[in-house]
Amino acid sequence: MKIFARLFFTLLFMGHAMAQETPQTQLPRIALSAGIHQMDIQVALTPEQHQIGLMYRSEMPQNEGMLFVFQAPSKQCFWMKNTILPLTAAFVADDGSIVNLEDMKPQTTDSHCSLKPVRYVLEMNQGWFAKKGLKAGSKLAGRPFNN
């Protein structure tokens, strides 16, 4: 019986460890836009989804990203632990306006923070916002923004 219990807990632990190193790809999706630029966005709503974010992904299509939705506006800080892709984080106000943009280097624990309290953070491939001419003050449209 002891052997069975040890085997069970070993397999349980291994399954949990493996699940943590798998990219989350089955999150709900929404469409966002910035002027003429369309985005296909996965939405991370829970603390667990926030924690995993875009970790462990080796690629992401050009117009895809992830929107992190928090319960209330507050200072948001992100890092890139276990994240392979270089990303840009847009810290976004409730009305969809970009507060600030932060380029984030893969596999680092440097903090990248909003300049003021925000409820939303949109991560896209690094350089996506710059290539589209988007900067602080630019507006995003679509659910959940109030526009």
Per-range role (PLM):
Residues 10-19:
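Hydrophobic h-region of N-terminal signal peptides that target proteins for export
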Residues 20-147:
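Compact, glycine-rich, soluble single-domain proteins
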